[in-house]
C-alpha cells in the first residue's frame, strides 16, 4: 500500500471514529492488521464465550485463530459434524459474551450496512450477545448511506457468494440481479444507525483492505 493511501485511510478513519462515537458506538482506528489484532484482543475479556458469523476480516487479522487458541470459550460453527449441530452452534452465538462480525459497508457518517442469507449474523448484531465487535477494513467505507447500501449489494454480496455452492445469477455473472432465488444470500439487509445500549457495538477500523 502506498503512503498516500495510508494517509487517506487514516484521515477518513479519524472522521469515521468521531461519527461512530456520536452514534454511541465505541470506535478505534488502527493503521494495520497487527495493531488491530492487539486492540481487538484488549476488548475481549479472558474466559469470554466468543462466537462469529462469516467474519472474514476478523480471520484475516488473525483474530479468529487467536480466539480459538487463547483463553476463550470459542463457539466455532465450522467444528460441527452435522447440519443440526451447526444450527445449534449458530443459536449459541446469539447468547455469546462477544460476537465477532465484519461489515459489508459503512457510511462515512457512521451507519453500518450488512446483508445476510440465513440472518444469524444480523440477528446477533441487533440483539443477544453482550458485546458485538466489528472488524472493518477502510475499503468498506463509502461517502453516503446510499453508497454503502449499493456497495453491500453490488460488491460485497456477489464477491461473498463465490465462497458458496449456491446457484444464483451473481455466481455466473459476478453482478447483482436483485434475484429471488431460493439460494439467494441477500435475504436480510440491516442498517445499524445508532447503538443502544451505548458501547455495546464496538468497531476496530483497520487501515487496510480487508474482506469483501
Language model features: what each stretch is:
Residues 1, 21-24, 71-74, 85-87, ...:
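N-terminal start-of-chain detector that recognizes signal peptides
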Residues 3, 10, 26, 42, ...:
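Glutamate identity and glutamate-enriched acidic tracts
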Residues 3-4, 78-80, 132-139:
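Flexible, glycine/proline-enriched loop segments at strand-loop-helix junctions
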Residues 9-90, 94-99:
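N-terminal active-site beta-alpha-beta segment that forms phosphate/nucleotide-binding
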Residues 94-212:
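Conserved phosphate- and dinucleotide-binding cores of soluble alpha/beta proteins
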